[in-house]
């Protein structure tokens, strides 16, 4: 798999935009990443077990991507870690403490930016901050390349700009764990790759732990230290991505990891036997990159 011209152009553009942003956030001012441990977690809905004895760890500052087919339990796991729902069995800890006691260290970024339409961009970023930290919100907005949009209304922003504001709103609280629930799924190809570069740059600079849920295997390879595959509520694969950063989408090593993960996903495709390779690849493309869907839970 070689990088196409659209990807190449997007990567070049992303690099240019990143060089233009300010850098008010730094590792020196951040608390650092948190150690995540999901221990034997079970989650049921209406008697049906969605997650079965999940064991997952993330070291402080590690970037872990979770992939899998629709309905496998990816977003459910993220909601449990975020504290939006409770596990039926098992435990989730951050730095060996119950996750519920460290909720102030967790922030979630969704596919829907969830900006308040009646507040301007800077006011959205500053939500929940004391008045004396308003300048900090402006600095973080500059960090994501939107200094000149501080007084704009959300309705005037593009999809990519709205997600940049959502990212700034998360980072202004200095999270030690950033949870990303398909935050780029509704963006066009150029904007998606640009946002990947921005997220990676800020993660490397600030050192927070990141957990990304995505249907896009290429995105997982581009961003993650490890790729975890969930199948039928179980962890079926845990692949380390041993590639130098920033990742080169068109490299042979990148393509090999991407293909290996896709093949592993396709092994579990319903009725895969007897289906041609081209049909399987088409099914994988459809199932691993989804369009916008409604958000079913509140922050």
Swiss-Prot record:
Main localization of the protein described in the UniProt heading: membrane
EC number(s) from the headed UniProt entry: 7.6.2.14
InterPro entries: AAA+_ATPase, ABC_transporter-like_ATP-bd, ABC_transporter-like_CS, ABC_transporter_ATP-bind, P-loop_NTPase
Keywords per UniProt: ATP-binding, Cell inner membrane, Cell membrane, Membrane, Nucleotide-binding, Translocase, Transport
Reaction catalyzed: ATP + H2O + aliphatic sulfonate-[sulfonate-binding protein]Side 1 = ADP + phosphate + aliphatic sulfonateSide 2 + [sulfonate-binding protein]Side 1
Amino-acid positions noted as binding ATP in the UniProt annotation, renumbered to this chain: 68-75
Alphabetized PANTHER family for the sequence: ALIPHATIC SULFONATES IMPORT ATP-BINDING PROTEIN SSUB, TAURINE IMPORT ATP-BINDING PROTEIN-RELATED
Entry protein name: Aliphatic sulfonates import ATP-binding protein SsuB
Source organism (scientific name): Cupriavidus pinatubonensis (strain JMP 134 / LMG 1197)
């Amino acid at each position: 798999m070689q990088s196409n011209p659209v990807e190449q152009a997007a990567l070049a553009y992303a690099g240019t935009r990143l060089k233009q942003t300010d850098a008010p956030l730094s590792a020196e001012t951040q608390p650092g990443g948190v150690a995540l441990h999901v221990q034997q977690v079970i989650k049921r809905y209406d008697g049906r077990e969605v997650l079965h004895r999940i064991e997952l760890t993330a070291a402080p500052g590690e970037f872990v991507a979770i992939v899998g087919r629709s309905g496998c339990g990816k977003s459910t796991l993220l909601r449990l870690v975020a504290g939006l729902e409770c596990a039926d069995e098992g435990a989730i800890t951050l730095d060996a403490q119950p996750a519920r006691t460290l909720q102030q260290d967790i922030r979630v970024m969704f596919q829907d930016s969830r900006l308040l339409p009646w507040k301007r961009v800077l006011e959205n970023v500053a939500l929940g901050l004391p008045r004396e930290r308003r300048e900090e919100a402006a600095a973080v907005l500059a960090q994501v390349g939107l200094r000149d949009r501080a007084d704009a209304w959300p309705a005037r922003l593009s999809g990519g700009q709205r997600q940049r504001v959502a990212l700034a709103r998360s980072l202004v609280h200095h999270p030690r764990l950033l949870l990303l629930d398909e935050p780029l799924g509704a963006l066009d190809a150029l904007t998606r790759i640009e946002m990947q570069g921005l997220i990676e740059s800020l993660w490397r600079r600030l050192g927070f732990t990141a957990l990304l849920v995505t249907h896009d295997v290429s995105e997982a390879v581009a961003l993650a230290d490890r790729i975890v595959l969930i199948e039928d509520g179980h962890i079926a694969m845990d692949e380390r991505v041993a590639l130098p950063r920033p990742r080169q989408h068109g490299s042979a090593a990148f393509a090999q990891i991407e293909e290996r993960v896709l093949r592993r996903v396709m092994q579990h495709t319903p009725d895969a036997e007897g289906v041609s390779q081209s049909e399987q690849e088409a099914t994988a493309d459809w199932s691993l990159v989804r369009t916008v869907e409604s958000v079913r839970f509140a922050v």
